[in-house]
């Protein structure tokens, strides 16, 4: 992609997503996410009726009488976008590739963030963290994010959501709102070991931060068409195989693998209480995103 082509695509996404964030998501974003974060303010002596869960045991031990931690609502929110840049994003059989939809969704969220005078940052990840853009405010910062969303090429092609979430936990000491944007292909082992759908980094991140998952996938990720002999390449491992798609058992096995992944995701959502939405590249992502803001 030439510099001129990149600028044209950035401008196109800016026009589309900035308008969406300003006209559709601004109010919903503010009411749903603004003020969720709580920042430590001070300690004071315990008073009858205070929540005992707020007791600061270290100070209490030193002072020989109970003290509690006092928190105040954070007026400024930090939003982190965790964007999957693994090989499987470079796939699309419908109107556009998954990476294009991911870029538009991330841009819409980024513009919604700065419309509310909040900071937004990005973590690009494959099977490791590929790039970190620290959270900042301002339109120029969002345009920089969009350029990276469109042009960044990772060093690796696999997927490891744990690496991204561990990085988030270490990088963001204070509570933030985070969106995990991925197709989640390769995020879990297949077949899934019983009871292993939720990993420690997912649990820790979902407790520390306001974490939501946005799954973006292509129709053909879930179902294989009956088109006869087809050469298939795994975009994350590079392995190529021939598949006779006219055989029903082949198509069924493909669909079963997809269902196994979805079951793992559902287990993760259920055990962590994580907000989530799933969308195909040929669906209206605006309607899907609105589900996260309600």
Question: Where are the regions that the model predicts?
Answer:
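A cross-taxon signal for low-complexity, glycine/charged-rich
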Residues: 194-198
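DG-centered beta-turn motif at the end of beta-strands
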Residues: 57, 84-86, 122, 168, ...
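Conserved phosphate-coordination/catalytic loops
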Residues: 100, 155-162, 256-259
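Short, electropositive alpha-helical surface patch
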Residues: 132-147, 267, 293-294
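Short, surface-exposed recognition loops or helix-turn segments adjacent to catalytic cores
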Residues: 122-127, 132, 158-166, 181-182
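Von Willebrand factor
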Residues: 141-176
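An amphipathic, basic-hydrophobic helix/alpha-beta surface used to engage anionic
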Residues: 1-136, 177, 187-188, 222
């Amino acid at each position: 992609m030439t510099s001129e082509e990149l600028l044209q695509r950035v401008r196109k996404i800016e026009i589309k997503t900035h308008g969406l964030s300003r006209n559709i998501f601004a109010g919903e974003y503010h009411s749903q996410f603004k003020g969720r974060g709580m920042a430590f303010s001070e300690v004071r002596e315990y008073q009858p009726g205070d929540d005992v869960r707020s007791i600061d045991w270290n100070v209490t031990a030193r002072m020989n009488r109970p003290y509690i931690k006092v928190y105040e609502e954070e007026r400024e929110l930090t939003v982190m976008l965790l964007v999957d840049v693994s090989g499987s994003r470079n796939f699309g059989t419908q109107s556009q590739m998954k990476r294009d939809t991911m870029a538009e969704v991330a841009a819409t969220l980024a513009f919604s963030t700065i419309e509310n005078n909040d900071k937004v940052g990005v973590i690009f990840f494959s099977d490791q963290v590929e790039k970190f853009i620290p959270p900042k405010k301002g339109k120029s910062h969002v345009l920089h994010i969009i350029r990276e969303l469109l042009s960044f090429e990772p060093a690796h092609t696999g997927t490891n959501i744990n690496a991204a979430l561990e990085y988030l936990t270490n990088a963001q000491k204070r509570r933030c709102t985070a969106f995990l944007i991925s197709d989640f292909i390769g995020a879990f082992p297949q077949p899934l070991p019983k009871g292993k759908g939720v990993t420690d980094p997912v649990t820790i991140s979902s407790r520390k931060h306001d974490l939501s998952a946005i799954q973006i996938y292509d129709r053909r990720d879930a179902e294989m068409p009956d088109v006869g002999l087809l050469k298939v390449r795994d975009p994350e491992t590079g392995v190529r195989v021939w598949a006779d798609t006219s055989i029903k058992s082949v198509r069924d096995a493909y669909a079963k693998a997809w269902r196994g992944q979805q079951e793992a995701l559902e287990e993760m959502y259920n055990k962590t209480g994580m907000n989530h939405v799933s969308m195909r590249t040929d669906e209206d992502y605006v309607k899907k995103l609105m589900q996260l803001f309600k």
